[in-house]
UniProtKB/Swiss-Prot annotation:
This protein is involved in the repair of mismatches in DNA. It is possible that it carries out the mismatch recognition step. This protein has a weak ATPase activity. The gene is mutS. GO terms for biological process: mismatch repair. Keywords: ATP-binding, DNA damage, DNA repair, DNA-binding, Nucleotide-binding. This is DNA mismatch repair protein MutS. It comes from Streptococcus agalactiae serotype V (strain ATCC BAA-611 / 2603 V/R). ATP binds at G603, P604, N605, M606, S607, G608, K609, S610. InterPro entries: DNA_mismatch_repair_MutS, DNA_mismatch_repair_MutS-lik_N, DNA_mismatch_repair_MutS/MSH, DNA_mismatch_repair_MutS_C, DNA_mismatch_repair_MutS_clamp, DNA_mismatch_repair_MutS_core, DNA_mismatch_repair_MutS_N, DNA_mismatch_repair_MutS_sf. GO terms for cellular component: cytosol.
Length: 858
């Protein structure tokens, strides 16, 4: 049987596809991007496009699917959003001039981590992460946002830190520079749903790589660079020099902690609404929005940097009218970072340059407004603002205000910018008049009253003559086309004018394109200055945003202390307050003196324990961002980390139960926390048997108290734990107050000193709407259980009353009354001392001394 032959075009496709086996290959053929073989079958299903075949009559037709080139971006977006790579093969020569098969090559590979263009633009960062290791114990991690040029690297000492940083960066694609174990591969691909791309080669760019980085950081950064250049197929002038950062330079929080605190999105809805980001976002620019997210994600630990931000916010609060002018001016600023990156990618169109020009037109006014504050705190910012008047002049002089996005259809360069272009336009403009003159002249000479000149791409300019007037056609007319009811004619004069006009049009279009490319190249030389300007404007935008929020919600400037004390007077949970309204929210004060490390919080479910704990965390985060906070007065230490376990949730992806997740997060806290950390644990230990959970909860509290010394809030439903305050000197009990009247319970949402006396679980069930008969039965059972408990504690048998102390203890154990806490280690000695006292020969003074000595033993 003869081997089926493959056409040269399909052979070209197969040769290119061989180099991109892990990507969908979009193969440009005329006005379509075609996909073949398995790519076509899969793409047709995913994109819901028609699946056809090439060579339908062949024994084995080749599956084929295609999308129009002008709408391809929306299909690329769908594939990339689902985690696929897309290789784009373009025609590299004019098909009309090609000899043989049109030359094609891949010009870009779009991956989840390298998206620059999208039909659904998003102001958020899109980070591509690279990791490398020599011993799988220490790791270099580098990340980049290809759309903005941001490039950073750090060194991490364990894989859990790598995992946490990847989650915090919300990366979707990881470039791996070493051989992963099966376990780590499964973790990244299956549990974290990441696209992995392996890269062995390194690209050393002396302009981007800082030699002061560690070897692993350099390796990760260079492999990341190599991957980006290999997929983007071009020099990227907008990439910034890699910046080293340390995790410890910021307030450390795990992804789970940020999620439980609803920092960047509401954990229940995965939406912005209801998050801290939603509350604080009064930014007016895309760069400011990204920077605000970064500030929330990475609060500071440097007191000086925090105070620098506070000082500027205070200035913005003190000068309302100037700040209002500043806010209005920021509205006219486009996304400088991404416009600069589009220039670097060679994708910037006339509209992009117009937006950049309009932005640069606003910068002098923004600088002038900042100067008008006349405050030294703003001097550094003012001095950083580079107005670049020559670039603004170039763009606004060269690009026509009405220019569209396309760069090949003309009308993009302003009149007066280029003399030759103006000449071509004059020919085209006057040519229209010349044609009108020819039409009038020939109509009069021929006597054909309906004679007119029309135009189409096939025949060019022609005289339109109906059949009834064919006898009047002059001899110098020559036929160009015959139709059913008319004919088309040309003349030498018309052809000459047409030639001049078409040449002028073609030359004009080509010249406009060349001029635009030259202008864009000049803009590219300003990219680094534009990026610095973007950072400065973003900083101004975030600071004014925090000032606006502080003013709207009456926030105060927090103070900081070195005495490890927390003082929050009438604090509020910032986002809950915004949802409920200031008038409805019940504030709570929080106090930890230098001798208090742990608050043990008891109270009914739904009474506000979790809100109280989150209130403290959000106050710390907002304060260490440099912002103002929701309270009447705040004085805090600077924390180095926040650890939380708030809210129950199984980890369904990895198959871990609530209790396992609790223990893992507790492990992270007790191992990584320092005496400068904040720990928030809500109902820890509820996922196992009562005594197991209680024992673990107590041991964790003791461990934190004795060894970690971190400021800790520990909410619990184990009321027995409140007795710990008698043993642990730096633990205090607080509870959520309730009002019980006529069988009805009101949660006051107010924190008070001391332990709670009841849990009110049945009342919560009533609020939830459980059936009345079920609740009545629960009340009866509770009464019986409480009666039994009282009997065990206060009504021992008559025999036990008359027995000695040791027999009484044994009797309690036999009845099932377990002691949660160990008996004091001196109990036996106290008993011995009591038994040794001769009561009949004891003077009053000796009795007092004996009591004093016994008290010291307790």
């Amino acid at each position: 049987m003869a081997k089926p032959t493959i056409s040269p075009g399909m052979q070209q496709y197969l040769d290119i596809k061989e180099n991109y086996p892990d990507a969908f290959l979009l193969f440009r053929m005329g006005d379509f991007y075609e996909l073949f073989y398995d790519d076509a079958v899969k793409a047709a299903q995913i994109l819901e496009i028609s699946l056809t075949s090439r060579n339908k009559n062949a024994e084995k037709p080749i599956p084929m699917a295609g999308v129009p080139y002008h709408s391809a971006q929306q299909y690329i977006d769908v594939l990339v959003e689902l985690g696929y790579k897309v290789a784009i093969a373009e025609q590299m020569e004019d098909p009309k001039k090609a000899v043989g098969v049109v030359k094609r090559e891949v010009v870009q590979v779009v991956t989840p981590g390298t998206v620059v263009e999208s039909t659904k633009p998003d102001s958020a960062n899109n980070f591509l992460v690279a990791i490398d290791s020599q011993d799988q114990q220490t790791f270099g991690l580098a990340y980049m946002d290809v759309s903005t040029g941001e490039f950073q690297a750090t060194l991490l000492t364990d894989f859990e830190s790598v995992r946490s940083e990847i989650l915090n960066l919300k990366a979707r694609e990881i470039v791996v520079g070493y051989q992963l174990t099966d376990e780590k591969n499964h973790l990244l691909t299956k549990q974290m749903n990441l696209l992995l791309s392996y890269e062995d080669e390194r690209l050393n760019d002396i302009h981007l790589i800082d030699e002061q980085l560690t070897d692993l950081e350099i390796s990760a950064a260079e492999k990341l660079l190599q991957y980006v250049h290999r997929t983007q197929k071009r020099e990227l002038s907008h990439l910034q020099k890699v910046v080293h950062y340390e995790i410890k330079d910021y307030l450390q929080m795990s992804y789970a902690t940020k999620n439980s605190l609803d920092l960047l999105e509401n954990a229940r809805t995965s939406k912005k609404h209801g998050s801290l980001y939603w509350l604080l976002d009064e930014t007016k620019t895309a760069m400011g929005t990204r920077m605000l997210r970064t500030w929330i994600d990475r609060p500071l630990v440097s007191m000086n940097r925090i105070k620098e931000r506070q000082d500027i916010i205070q200035v913005f609060l003190d000068y309302f009218f100037e700040r209002n002018d500043l806010t209005e001016s920021l509205k006219g600023v486009y996304d400088i970072e991404r416009l600069a990156s589009r220039v670097s990618f060679g994708k910037a169109n006339p509209k992009d340059l117009l937006q950049l020009g309009q932005t640069l037109s606003q910068i002098p006014r923004i600088k002038m407004i900042l100067q008008s504050f006349n405050q030294p705190e703003l001097d550094i910012i003012v001095n950083k603002i580079d107005t670049m008047p020559e670039l603004e002049s170039l763009i606004n002089t060269a690009i026509a205000p009405e220019a569209q996005a396309t760069i090949t259809e003309g009308n993009i360069i302003k009149s007066g910018f280029d003399k030759q272009l103006d000449n071509y336009r004059t020919v085209m403009r006057e040519g229209t008049g010349w044609i009108a003159d020819i039409e009038a002249k020939e109509r009069a000479a021929s006597g054909i009253g309906t004679l007119k000149i029309d135009y189409n791409k096939k025949d060019g300019y022609y005289f339109h003559v109906t059949n009834s007037n064919l006898s009047l056609v002059p001899e110098h007319f020559f036929r160009k086309a015959t139709l059913k009811n008319s004919e088309r004619y040309g003349t030498a004069e018309l052809a000459k004018i047409e030639g001049e006009m078409l040449e002028a049009r073609e030359q004009s279009s080509n010249l406009e394109y060349d001029i635009f490319m030259r202008v864009r190249a000049q803009v590219e030389s300003y990219i680094k200055r534009l990026q610095e300007l973007a950072k400065t404007i973003a900083t101004v935008d975030v600071l004014q945003s925090l000032a606006v929020v502080a003013e709207n919600y009456h926030y105060v400037r927090p103070k900081f202390n070195d005495q490890h004390q927390i003082k929050i007077k009438n604090g509020r949970h910032a986002t809950v307050e915004k949802v409920m309204g200031v008038q409805e929210y019940i504030p709570n004060s929080i106090y930890f003196d230098s001798q208090t490390d742990i608050q043990l919080i008891t109270g009914p479910n739904m009474s506000g324990k979790s809100t109280y704990m989150r209130q403290l965390a959000l106050t710390v985060i907002m304060a260490q961002m440099g912002g103002f906070v929701s309270a009447d007065e705040v004085d805090l230490p600077v924390f180095d980390a926040i650890f939380t376990r708030i809210g129950a949730a199984d980890d369904l992806i990895s198959g871990q139960s609530t209790f396992m997740v609790e223990m893992m997060e507790a492990n992270q806290a007790v191992k990584r926390a320092s005496d400068k950390s904040l720990i928030l644990f809500d109902e820890l230990g509820r996922g196992t048997a009562t005594y197991d959970g209680m024992a673990l909860a107590q041991s964790i509290i003791e461990y934190i108290h004795d060894r970690v010394r971190a400021k800790t809030m520990f909410a619990t439903h184990y009321h027995e734990l409140t007795d710990l305050s008698e043993q642990l000197t730096r633990l205090v009990n607080v509870h959520v107050a309730t009002l019980e009247r006529d069988g009805e319970v009101t949660f006051l949402h107010k924190i008070e000193s001391g332990p709670a006396d009841k849990s009110y679980g049945i009342h919560v069930a009533k609020i939830a709407g459980l059936p009345i008969d079920l609740l009545d039965r629960a009340t009866d059972i509770l009464s019986q259980l409480e009666a039994d408990a009282v009997q065990l504690i206060v009504s021992p048998s008559q025999e036990a009353v008359t027995a000695d102390l040791n027999e009484e203890l044994d009797s309690e154990k036999q009845q099932g009354q377990l002691s949660l806490f160990e008996e004091p280690s001196n109990a036996g000695r106290v008993i011995e001392e009591l038994e040794a006292i001769d009561i009949m020969n004891l003077t009053p003074m000796q009795a007092m001394n004996a009591i004093f000595d016994l008290k010291k033993l307790l």
